[in-house]
Amino acid sequence: MLKLTSRVGPKRLSSGLKSSSFKVNATIISKKFQSSLNSKPNEVYTKLSDSEDPKRHQFFQYTWGSWMKNDQSEKSKRETKFSIEGITKLLQDLNVESKNQRNIDKSGEPFVKAPSQLKDGSYVLTQNLTSNLIGKEDSLLVKSIASIHEGKHNRIYKVTLSTGKELVLRIPYKLESEYSISQKIKSEVATMDFLNLKLGANVPKVVAYGANKVNSLQSPFILMEHIEGDLLMKQWDPLVADETEGSQEKLKSVIEPIAAFQEKLLSITFNKFGSLYFNDDVSVTDQSSLPYNGEENPLLTKRWRIGPSVEKSFSKNKNQLSEKEIKQYSRSIDADKPLETITSIAGIELENLRNRLALAQADSGNKVENVELIQKMIATFENLKTMSTKLFNPNSQSLMNAEELFKPRLYCPDLDPLNVILNSNKNNEPYFVDFEYTSIKPFILSSYPSFVGYQGAKIYNLEEDIPGYSEMDEVEKQQYQFMYYKTRNERLWELELNSRKHDLIAVASPHVKVLKSPYVQALDFKNDKDYLYIEGSIVQLQAMWEAYVANELCNATETEFPIAFTAEYLDEHQKDIEDYQMEIVSTPFAATSGWVPQDMFDSLKEQGIIVETENGDFKVETENVLKESE
């Protein structure tokens, strides 16, 4: 019998909602929320021969939260069904590969070679089939499988082997097209392989992977080393007061290891923009170009190549686009054309919006669309496309080390203490575990890690920057303290960057941040009305454009702003953005796109605060919230 473990209960809140996740009655709701669910994992035993065992159903279902709208549809996309018999078969095949003389050297240890395809269609990195990862026994069996985490894009299972070793099985949700998921897996595995073999970075070693459903598991997957230990996030206290003893050391204990890892990422400059893949996973054209210069290890010279970018914009909400349409914009870009990385983002969004508009006008889409809103979004991304080649001057003399800032470098968008495990088996060394959507782009276009990034008003000294601060009441002081702490944390990150990569510190310039804001906002385009933030960041440039042209910061010689905004349009835009912000503030759980942690959802529903509507959606019953607050 095989043991399956699926955890439900309060621990699901450990990743948590930020206090700003929903604005209306947030305090009231949170006070009334008390979980009554059992935190003990549910254990189920199943026969390997019974693939239709109903006990397995819960093991694959999404249980981390619920949605206020389209709940069943959203959960269905996150069902991670895979063949349990298939993973047993895969491990048996891996055991055979680990003993195959073609994969081991004279000392009996596996050596580095290109990924090998198994008969079932999956791939294995034979150099990682070591006794440290899978054990030494002649047979390799699955003892148990436990669901240990339901993330934003993947579900994580822990596979315990008969040898006592543990592996992580990662199954992606069906949130993107099959092509996009396939590209992401191929690139992420190659990126982790590069970080391990070339840079010697602390990342899990990948044992096997499948980029599509054609494998024993009947699902895309990555099977990798399990890292035991606590998350670095447990040490992160972003609002610790300066007066607290050891506060600076506490903050730096989290910032420094992540900054050190970024330093490794930045240590190599590449020959193209795009993403990393294994040689056989890119086109013949991309195979002809070396990813970087100076490689002397013969085992690595033909191992990796740069292919299409897997940055999130090329896959998020792009399910209706064909592989050909996506490739047109995600293709690799020559190193001497850095601004094309901005143009490509505008291009893919325009392609997607025009496709949506065509379906809406033909009344053949699968949802009701607001045609006027789509047309406004198209106009904004047309503006971004116009600005894309003008935002920066790659040869600017006013920008310190401009040449270095525009070189292709590795960028991981998920550098975060939530993705860092302190390996308890290796003296708590930090290991980095999430490389989805990693791309090669100009460093000047990269964003700070989200745990330290701050786009709000900066406060460097509460007493000096805020008139009358000392006379304010505590509630008002706390608002400014929050802004100060966010400013401080970002500043600590910039100081680390300056000490490690001084030649790249110009990214900290306020003018650089303003100039790249339209691009950054476009990368964060999640909901339709977010186009207003993109447009707003373009409008913001207008006031400073003449100065940017005069100082050769932007790639333009004409002082006239490239886009003509009428006064009427600017007034309308200001009203639209104010209305959108009010909509967000007045809609519970808007900041999480209607997602509610399951413990909270069940508790609020039991109290009558969340109620089901006639169409199967849910809403917050305001009257019941007010009653509970009395």
Curated annotation (Swiss-Prot):
Keyword terms, alphabetized: Mitochondrion, Transit peptide
Pfam family, one: APH
Signal peptide: none
Annotated transit peptide: 1-40
Gene3D superfamilies the record matches: Phosphorylase Kinase, domain 1
Main location: mitochondrion
Entry's localization field: Mitochondrion
InterPro entries reported in the protein's UniProt record: Aminoglycoside_PTrfase (IPR002575), Kinase-like_dom_sf (IPR011009), Mito_inheritance_9 (IPR051035)
Disulfide bonds: none
Any GO CC annotation of this UniProt entry: mitochondrion
Stated family: Belongs to the AIM9 family.
The name this protein goes by in its record: Altered inheritance of mitochondria protein 9, mitochondrial
